[in-house]
Amino acid sequence: MLATLSQIRAWSTEHLIDAAGYWTETADRWEDVFLQMRNQAHAIAWNGAGGDGLRQRTRADFSTVSGIADQLRRAATIARNGAGTIDAAQRRVMYAVEDAQDAGFNVGEDLSVTDTKTTQPAAVQAARLAQAQALAGDIRLRVGQLVAAENEVSGQLAATTGDVGNVRFAGAPVVAHSAVQLVDFFKQDGPTPPPPGAPHPSGGADGPYSDPITSMMLPPAGTEAPVSDATKRWVDNMVNELAARPPDDPIAVEARRLAFQALHRPCNSAEWTAAVAGFAGSSAGVVGTALAIPAGPADWALLGAALLGVGGSGAAVVNCATK
C-alpha cells in the first residue's frame, strides 16, 4: 500500500541525519577511549607476564573496537547519503503533486487525481480525464521510487550495522608461566572454613574472592586498616566490578594489586580524598561515554579510569596509591 499524501508531505530524514551524527561521535569516542588505554598500557613500567598480558589485551581490544568504529562510520556515510537521496525523491513527488494542482486538478489523500472543472465539453472532458490519469500515474511512480529509496537505505544500514551489537571481545590472553610460580597451600580436605567475616587460616578470604591475590587485600587480623571508609568502598567496588574476570586475568590481577596498595599504602587523607573523588568523576564519565560498547564497558571503564589515567584523575589514584 502506497503512502498517503499527508505522509509524503511529512516525510522526514531527520532521523538519518541524527543517527549519522551519533554514530560518528560514538565511533570517535570508542576509539579515543581504547586508544588511550592501549597507549598508556605501553607507557606503564610493568614488566613480566602481567604487563605483557595487559598490553596484549589492550592491543586486541583496540583492534576490535576500531573495526566496530569503522562499521559505524560507514553506516553514518550511508545515512547521510541516503538522507539526500530520500529527500530528493520526496521533493520529486511533491513537484508532481504541484504540477497536477497547477493544471487545475485535485490530488487526494489516496493520490488520486480528479478534475476540479465539472462543466466542460465532452472532448475537453475526455482529454482532461486522460491527463489526470497520466498525472496520477506519474505521482504513483515517484512515490514508489521514494519508498524504494527508503527501503534501500534501511537495508544498507541493517547490513552494515547488523552485527555491531553482537561483537564480543576476545577472552583473557593465555600467559605462559615461568618456572617459578606462586602457589597456595589450599588442601581439598583441609580445615572447615571459618564463618563469614572471620580470618581465613591461610590468610585468604572465603567467598567469591578467595583467590590468593584478592586475599592479600585483607588487613592483618586484629588491626584496623589505615584507610577511610571511602577507600574501602572504592576497593570493594573495584573488586565487584572485576569479579567476573578469571583470577589470573592480567587485568584483574593488576586491578587487585592497585586496590591492595590503596588499602595498605594510602596517601594522607586530603590527597586520597581528592584522588578518589577524581576517580569517581572520571569513572562515571568514561562509563557515560562508553555507552553501547559491547561486552564489558564497566570493567574496562573502571580499569581505564583507575589504572590507565583516563581523564587524568585515574593517574592521581595510581600515584596516590603507590606512594
UniProtKB/Swiss-Prot annotation:
Residues making up the signal peptide according to the UniProt record: 1-45
Topology within the bilayer: Multi-pass membrane protein
Bridged cysteine pairs (disulfide): none
Localization (cell): Cell membrane
TM region positions: 269-289, 290-310
UniProt key word Transmembrane helix: yes
GO CC, alphabetical: cytosol; plasma membrane
Region spans: Disordered: 186-227
Coiled coil: none
Alphabetical keyword list: Cell membrane, Membrane, Signal, Transmembrane, Transmembrane helix
Name of the protein this chain belongs to: Uncharacterized protein Rv2077c
Organism: Mycobacterium tuberculosis (strain ATCC 25618 / H37Rv)
